[in-house]
UniProtKB/Swiss-Prot annotation:
The active site is at 78 (proton donor/acceptor), 189 (proton donor/acceptor). One of its GO terms (molecular function) is glutamate racemase activity. Substrate binds at residues 15-16, 47-48, 79-80, 190-191. The gene is murI. Gene3D superfamilies: 3.40.50.1860. Keywords: Cell shape, Cell wall biogenesis/degradation, Isomerase, Peptidoglycan synthesis. The keyword Nucleotide-binding does not apply. PROSITE patterns: ASP_GLU_RACEMASE_2. It comes from Syntrophus aciditrophicus (strain SB). This is Glutamate racemase. It holds the Pfam family Asp_Glu_race. InterPro entries: Asp/Glu/hydantoin_racemase (IPR015942), Asp/Glu_race (IPR001920), Asp/Glu_racemase_AS_2 (IPR033134), Glu_race (IPR004391). The lineage of its organism: Bacteria, Pseudomonadati, Thermodesulfobacteriota, Syntrophia, Syntrophales. Belongs to the aspartate/glutamate racemases family. It catalyses: L-glutamate = D-glutamate. Provides the (R)-glutamate required for cell wall biosynthesis.
Length: 270
């Protein structure tokens, strides 16, 4: 096959930091022969405190960089960018664009039986109402109960994945959501899959957790098949990682998110 065939081109995944590596991990497991290129804007994280105009400008810069790498698909693995900048990305991109919010919302609608869905995420994501809007577009009858969980991201990055402090914090955050008798809980932050076992334990066995990273991987597999973009080669894929800064403990945190060693990371300037 011609090396310029679109099927052989990489999937481009981007985030403001390291959280999107949970999406890369899910893609590696779901699509083991796909080449993947990851971009983390680690010099300018967090995006949540930035203006809408700034986030859109950053998203356009990243999109242009990834398109120069000849990606066949763009995945917005950052909830903040997905909530604010998807239209900016789509307006620039000649290739398909997917995002974690849409994937998580679709999975939640498919899974809920009582039309009562909880959503947890960072304050920025929750305040944007992006998940609620996406779910309501798909199923207007759904009752949605959202909860901002400001402390979970730093606890994950500290590595306290099953720490008593993390468990107590999760219990406090989930209490009002669980009181609404939801049957489905969306993990609306790419850090949260690392807390999946703890959150399931706190929520109880009757609550279905929607892992937006897994949902994103499934949506990607479906799109590649429909658009005939699946890589037909059965050889070890190439993974490339780009960042705008290599902050303290980046390697350690990145490997925790990816679930394997993080190969050579290249620092770039936009």
């Amino acid at each position: 096959m011609n090396k310029n065939s679109p099927e052989l081109h990489p999937i481009g995944v981007f985030d403001s930091g390291v959280g999107g590596l949970t999406v890369v991990r899910a893609l590696m497991e779901r699509l083991p022969f796909e080449n993947i290129l990851y971009f983390g804007d680690t010099a300018r994280v967090p995006y949540g405190v930035k203006s809408v105009e700034t986030i859109n400008a950053y998203a356009r810069q990243i999109t242009e960089f990834l398109l120069r790498q000849e990606v066949k698909l763009l995945i917005i693995a950052c909830n903040t960018m997905a909530a604010v900048a998807r239209q900016s990305v789509e307006s620039l991109s000649p290739v398909p664009v997917l995002d974690v919010i849409d994937a998580g919302a679709r999975r939640a609608v498919a899974e809920t039986r009582t039309h009562s869905v909880g959503v947890i995420g960072t304050p920025t994501t929750i305040n944007s109402n992006a998940y609620a809007r996406a779910i309501c577009r798909l199923a207007p009858e759904t009752r949605i109960f959202s909860q901002a969980c400001a402390l979970l991201v730093p606890l994950v990055e500290e590595g306290w994945l099953d720490h008593p402090v993390t468990r107590l914090t999760a219990q406090e955050y989930l209490r009002p959501v669980l009181a609404e008798h939801i049957d489905t809980l969306v993990l609306g932050c790419t850090h949260y899959p690392l807390l999946k076992a703890l959150l399931q334990d706190v929520a109880g066995p009757d609550i279905h957790l929607v892992d937006s990273a897994e949902a994103m991987a499934d949506a990607t597999a479906e799109l590649l098949q429909v658009q005939h973009l699946t890589n037909p080669e059965r050889i070890p894929p190439e993974y490339r990682f780009y960042v705008t800064d290599v902050p303290l403990r980046f390697q350690q945190i990145g490997e925790r998110f990816l679930g394997r060693s993080l190969p050579g990371v290249e620092r770039v300037q936009l």
